[in-house]
């Protein structure tokens, strides 16, 4: 079988459409799956000896959250080491990373697999994987045809990585080094709230502004701080962490600013504080709202003048530190209550960030579940850990008051319970493995199967209604903010909401 010019032209056009948008790779994968008639396909980005899914088709949604470390996936390692098309025979002894992850085929294993490494020059930047349930599914395609597909995909991925780096570093093309490995904290999520947060992180990271990160317990505020530091000019210098809630009042000042020998009982030598350790780098103050008013005053002085005094020392030391602070409290309310200094609040919140709770992140819960499943698989030496349809349904309808941290612990506990009831190294997580409070669930199929008796207008209105509801929830029912998120005029949004029955 050979590809027609029209087929190749269509693939090339899909690769160029909407460059810079979230779905540019999804269109490629969808087109390839149709052309190659495979059961599943994935586009993966290579970074620091792991493959990160950028787009999938025909695979369970949680695959997008998984991070495939080469040492745990021999097929992917073989693709990474190869300089050409890799075909895995049906009787290959190497486990397929997507076994159990094709919806409706969870109990079956992939029988045909092709891997296409993607290169920019001599540098591996990603891979395309094609999977089928029939052993000879890809025999009709020659290696030359598959190389052509790989070349088109590699060009698109290469350009996207270059644009991404130019946008994040604000560099001129002549200064760019697009294929060097750039450390980047993994922030998993494609929901509107997380997409907006990532954009704001990218904006503020390049500056030297202090940042106040707000969010409920367990939402990942420390991860946000790491992402800001790693994307900043200070990334080559230390990121120092201090949990203010765990500081006894008697040692808090010493922890922050250090002390000299003999400053107090037990001070047997000079000791640097966190500000000195973070000099030329970043200091992350977690739970900043727990600091006493006395310490808040001393912290304010450092932010104002850039110098510190060790406990027991009259000399001042200059420090160059960027401060990132996090809190699960409403500091505006704390200021009004007299528990937090207004001047310190304004110094810290030059660029405030809000981390959305997991219950407002939609399908991100499934992506995160996939990430934690893959972590468990590696740590416990399992061949696979997958979620059943019932488990996915439960996770999507539970509110997670403990947010991402609660989800992580729930997945780890579920894996232990599932292993206790099943022999072997393959684990399928069922709803009964999760000890959540009672949740009212629709049938598992209800979330995935569309209403077939709707006409086009009814289906469109249902989609619009649900989109507006989600946007309102994420913006605390602020219609102006909702309109900005949906990129529409607020007056038009009000009219549409009335027509859809969302407003009186």
Swiss-Prot record:
One of its GO terms (molecular function) is DNA binding. ATP binds at residues 215-222, 278-287. Residues 479-498 bind DNA. The keyword Disulfide bond does not apply. The keyword DNA damage does not apply. One of its GO terms (biological process) is phosphorelay signal transduction system. Residues 187-416 form the Sigma-54 factor interaction domain. Keywords: ATP-binding, DNA-binding, Nucleotide-binding, Phosphoprotein, Transcription, Transcription regulation. Pathway: Nitrogen metabolism; nitric oxide reduction. Pfam families: GAF, Sigma54_activat. SMART domains: AAA, GAF. Signal peptide: none annotated. The modification 4-aspartylphosphate is found at residue 57. CDD domains: AAA. Required for the expression of anaerobic nitric oxide (NO) reductase, acts as a transcriptional activator for at least the norVW operon. Activation also requires sigma-54. This is Anaerobic nitric oxide reductase transcription regulator NorR.
